[in-house]
Design a protein with these regions (language model features):
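Short, active-site-adjacent cap segments at secondary-structure transitions
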Residues: 1, 76-79, 108-111, 125
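Glycine-rich phosphate/nucleotide-binding loop
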Residues: 3-18, 24-32, 113-117, 122-196, ...
Length: 211
């Protein structure tokens, strides 16, 4: 990413590019930005992330007037750290540019509260990898292990396999394997693990639209 940023340069007004990844939720999906490009961020960088994420969500994913939320530890005024509190004040001062919902907490991530979640790259990467690990533990280790313990549960699984497979497909991290680097004068898509080998139609369509 560093070499790509140097070669392609950042857009005017953008100091640091950010990784935007699409994640599933109760209804549809949301954009998480930054997902790991910059572990630390200044308040103005979070504002840039909000604008970039909102534009990506609207013009690439087709979400009309996307709601933008700032990840913090509480929705009350002053509940976050110095950076998020300052970023919150800045985001509230630019009405009309983005549809700013306000601060959100971790338990709201996968609810239909906002369409874009803004954070620094350290927080975003922890969220992303925790969600991926939880998917594996839930379906392969926890649920799969419990089903195998009892023949009655195995029979029940056969009747509910359609719903089980649909949820597993929706939550599978490989469906969301490509993360565009936003804020540069060009196209860079970051992928990890086997995500490019198993890249799905939603990700491919996102790549085409972004390009």
């Amino acid at each position: 990413m560093a070499s790509g940023t140097i070669r392609l340069r950042t857009m005017e007004g953008i100091e640091r590019p950010a990784l935007a990844t699409v994640m599933p939720r109760q209804e549809g999906h949301f954009v998480l930005i930054d997902a790991g490009a910059n572990p630390s961020a200044k308040p103005e960088h979070l504002v840039h992330n909000a604008v970039l994420g909102s534009a990506y969500c609207q013009h690439v994913l087709g979400t009309e007037n996307p709601r933008v939320g700032l990840m913090t530890i509480g929705t009350e005024e002053g509940k976050g750290n110095e950076t998020t509190n300052a970023a919150n004040d800045l985001l509230k001062s630019i009405p009309g540019i983005i549809n700013y919902h306000g601060p959100i907490e971790g338990f709201q991530l996968f609810e239909n509260v906002v369409d874009v979640v803004v954070c620094d790259g350290f927080t975003g990467n922890v969220i992303l990898k925790t969600a991926e690990s939880l998917f594996k533990c839930l379906f392969k280790d926890f649920l799969g292990g419990e089903i195998k313990k009892n023949p009655v549960r195995q029979l029940g699984y056969l009747f509910s396999k359609g719903a089980y497979d649909a949820i597993r497909t929706q939550l599978n991290p490989e469906r969301y394997g490509g993360a565009p680097l936003l804020g540069i004068k060009g196209n860079i898509l970051k992928a990890h693990g086997l995500s490019l080998i198993h890249i799905s139609e939603p990700t491919r369509l996102g790549m085409i639209s972004y390009a």
